[in-house]
Amino acid sequence: MKVGIMGGTGNIGEGLARRIXIGGKYDVMIKGRDKA
């Protein structure tokens, strides 16, 4: 989660989800892609 929030993996969807707020639901997908 730290890498996703502050790391900035270059995922535009991550930034948008975080701003909208829907980061919780997209967080799972982002985390899965980050590890993969």
Swiss-Prot record:
<keyword id="KW-0560">Oxidoreductase</keyword>
<protein>
    <recommendedName>
        <fullName>F420-dependent NADP reductase</fullName>
        <ecNumber>1.5.1.40</ecNumber>
    </recommendedName>
</protein>
<dbReference type="GO" id="GO:0102261">
    <property type="term" value="F:8-hydroxy-5-deazaflavin:NADPH oxidoreductase activity"/>
</dbReference>
<comment type="similarity">
    <text>Belongs to the F420-dependent NADP reductase family.</text>
</comment>
<comment type="subunit">
    <text>Homotetramer.</text>
</comment>
<feature type="binding site">
    <location>
        <begin position="9"/>
        <end position="12"/>
    </location>
    <ligand>
        <name>NADP(+)</name>
    </ligand>
</feature>
<keyword id="KW-0521">NADP</keyword>
<dbReference type="InterPro" id="IPR036291">
    <property type="entry name" value="NAD(P)-bd_dom_sf"/>
</dbReference>
<comment type="function">
    <text>Catalyzes the reduction of NADP(+) with F420H(2) via hydride transfer, and the reverse reaction, i.e. the reduction of F420 with NADPH. In M.organophilum, an alcohol-fermenting methanogen containing an NADP-dependent alcohol dehydrogenase, is probably involved in the regeneration of F420H(2) required for CO(2) reduction to methane. Thus, during growth on alcohol and CO(2), the F420-dependent NADP reductase probably has the function of coupling the NADP-dependent oxidation of the alcohol to the aldehyde with the F420-dependent reduction of CO(2) to methane.</text>
</comment>
